[in-house]
Design a protein with these regions (language model features):
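A short, proline-enriched helix->beta-strand linker immediately N-terminal to the Walker B motif
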Residues: 169-173
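P-loop NTP-binding/switch modules centered on Walker-like glycine-rich loops
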Residues: 184, 188-266
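Conserved ABC ATPase signature
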Residues: 150-154, 158
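Conserved ABC transporter NBD signature motif
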Residues: 71-79, 91
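Helix-to-loop junction immediately C-terminal to a conserved catalytic motif
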Residues: 63
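Short catalytic/signature loops enriched in Gly
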Residues: 4, 18-23, 237-334
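Conserved ABC ATPase "signature" region
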Residues: 128-145, 254-255
Length: 334
């Protein structure tokens, strides 16, 4: 049986909106709203969704950059929300993050070797520092001569490799990958994803891989979850997710992925969502997706669905009153 490394229990991250002369709180932005997730050791959990769905806020909350409004985060079975500063300092040896923009996440005045070695210095692991840094550089596909170069002398893909080398310097157990390839060219994306897969096998890493493109994590994630307005809409193992997605939002995202066969692409019917993503400061009542859902009923406007198994598949959870089944998919394609 797989052992849970990270557990997220009913996590909420609400940001107050203040206004008026006395700056009183008028409402809250529910960036993360009742999220429950489990990541087992050695697995990759993929989190996808549109911009503003709360996935990056979730990442920052997991790593401790912001304290949640309520809920709990467990790492190796222990709650980390009330850790002291010293305990958090030790925890960050085991949880590291790779950021979206490979340029702004690097100090432009520091040499690549110093950037990669910074975590080692912070934890006073300075014995044979230069040799260790060059080993890390070799591990991510950088040359030893790159040690003395500045970030602007590298390509986008190389800069992201520097960020990855820095993240694995302390031999962490969990990496939070916050859209690590979204700022890169498609050809470079594949190289970086292959690197991450190789590192996971070699170093026994566990990933939380955040992306806005389902095609990016199709071949890397063991478990895939979709977020919308701070909530998890659907989550399952990768095979079930891509072959038997049940939530209308998930199916809309999947139908937006181009097919390699032009004939099949031309014949395929897409699920087109109407309207724009509502404001998280003023989410719709009932099911938060009902304003854009092509299958929404009156019941959806006043009642909130829960994330639960459908048709007896305990590993496939859907937050929808009227999930898409095989018959409905056939009607869509006709």
């Amino acid at each position: 049986m797989s052992e849970a490394l990270l557990e997220i229990r009913d996590l909420n991250m609400h940001f107050p909106i203040k206004g008026g002369v006395f700056q009183k709180t008028k409402k809250h932005v529910k960036a993360v709203n009742g999220v429950n997730l489990t990541v087992n050791k050695g697995e990759t959990l993929g989190i996808v969704g549109e911009s503003g769905c709360g996935k990056s806020t979730l990442a920052r909350t997991i790593i401790g950059l912001q304290k949640p409004t309520s809920g709990d985060i467990l790492f190796e079975g222990k709650s980390i929300l009330h850790y002291s500063h010293k305990e958090m300092h030790q925890l960050r040896r085991n949880i590291q993050m790779v950021y979206q923009d490979p340029y702004t996440s690097l100090n432009p005045r520091m040499k690549a070797g110093d950037i990669i070695g910074a975590p080692l210095k912070a934890y006073r692991m300075t014995n044979n520092l230069e040799r260790r840094v060059k080993e890390l550089m070799d591990l991510v596909g950088l040359k030893a001569d790159d040690y003395y170069k500045l970030p602007h002398q590298f390509s986008g893909g190389q800069r992201q490799r520097i960020g990855i080398a820095r993240a694995i310097a302390l031999n962490p157990k969990l990496l939070i990958l916050d859209e690590p390839v979204s700022a890169l060219d498609v050809s470079v994306q594949a190289q970086v994803i292959n690197l991450l897969e190789d590192l996971q096998k070699e170093l026994n890493l566990t990933y939380v891989f955040i992306a806005h493109d389902l095609s990016v994590i199709k071949h890397t994630a063991d478990i895939v979850g979709v977020m919308y307005l701070g909530k998890v809409m659907e989550i399952s193992d990768s095979e079930s997710f891509y072959n038997d997605a049940r939530h209308p939002y998930t199916n809309a995202l999947l139908s937006a992925i181009p097919l390699p066969d032009p004939k099949k692409e031309k014949m395929r019917e897409r699920i087109v969502l109407s309207g724009e993503l509502p404001s998280p400061a003023n989410p719709p009542t009932g099911c938060v997706f009902h304003t854009r859902c092509p299958f929404a009923q009156e019941y959806c406007k006043t009642n909130t669905p829960i994330l639960e198994a459908k048709d007896g598949n305990d590993g496939h959870l859907v937050s929808c009153f009227y999930p898409i089944n095989i018959e409905k998919k056939q009607l869509i394609s006709e």
